[in-house]
């Protein structure tokens, strides 16, 4: 298995698909990395030479990926919450922050339904 940016890339996959195993790299960015490094994106990872892998590592190193990207996203959300802006408040409450309706739906953000309390007589 090839190791790029601290991630094991599956050997049986094409280079373009294998690079998407790295957090922060999708299909489009993977294809542009392959083109920039001169590696055929249809080539299997197991068929890559050490020189090819080194070129790929160099190109991937130009982007913010994996732990650094996760940390950056977390810090951005924390900043919004500290500011107390609308999006930060919605993050804090665990509700959708992009204007979706919450009277019904929004189950992914809100989590499973809680049982309603029975009224005492």
Curated annotation (Swiss-Prot):
Which branch of life, at top level? Bacteria
Q: Provide the residue span(s) of the region labelled Disordered.
A: 92-121
Assigned GO CC terms: cytosol; small ribosomal subunit
The UniProt keywords, alphabetically, are:
Ribonucleoprotein, Ribosomal protein, RNA-binding, rRNA-binding, tRNA-binding
Q: Which GO terms describe its biological process?
A: translation
Alphabetical list of InterPro entries matching this protein: Rbsml_uS13_C (IPR027437), Ribosomal_uS13 (IPR001892), Ribosomal_uS13-like_H2TH (IPR010979), Ribosomal_uS13_bac-type (IPR019980), Ribosomal_uS13_CS (IPR018269)
Record's keyword annotation contains RNA-binding: yes
Molecular functions per Gene Ontology: rRNA binding; structural constituent of ribosome; tRNA binding
| Gene3D superfamilies registered for this protein in UniProt | 1.10.8.50, 30s ribosomal protein s13, domain 2
Subunit notes for this chain?
Part of the 30S ribosomal subunit. Forms a loose heterodimer with protein S19. Forms two bridges to the 50S subunit in the 70S ribosome.
Q: Note the PANTHER family from the entry.
A: 30S RIBOSOMAL PROTEIN S13/40S RIBOSOMAL PROTEIN S18, SMALL RIBOSOMAL SUBUNIT PROTEIN US13M
Physiological role: Located at the top of the head of the 30S subunit, it contacts several helices of the 16S rRNA. In the 70S ribosome it contacts the 23S rRNA (bridge B1a) and protein L5 of the 50S subunit (bridge B1b), connecting the 2 subunits; these bridges are implicated in subunit movement. Contacts the tRNAs in the A and P-sites.
The family line of this record is: Belongs to the universal ribosomal protein uS13 family.
Q: Quote the protein name from its UniProt record.
A: Small ribosomal subunit protein uS13
Source organism of this protein record: Burkholderia thailandensis (strain ATCC 700388 / DSM 13276 / CCUG 48851 / CIP 106301 / E264)
